[in-house]
Amino acid sequence: MRRISRNEKAVRGSMRVNGRDIATLENADYIIPDGTYPVSVTFSPRFKRMLPLIGNVPGRSGIRIHRGTKPEHSKGCILVSAAMEQQLTAEWLALQASNEPIKIIIDNEN
């Protein structure tokens, strides 16, 4: 995932998954530090559905990739469109079932 632009409230980025570019949005107050993190798909009690969970984020837990359209919809999670949330979850569940490791690389361009 690359962060492309930032203002006082939001950080916009792009995540490349299986050849597709997916728009991302983060709350500027809660961005994840640059690095490589493991991803697993687990049930979220808060959202009541299966969602990607980003692991090993320093000092944080429960960081998800989920749908949202405004930076206020996140307290540290990566936001994507509703359609992309469903596709990512389905694709990553299949990878997880085949024991393929899933990771996200976060890189700050700005």
Predicted segment positions?
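Cell wall/extracellular polymer interaction/catalysis modules
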Residues: 1-110
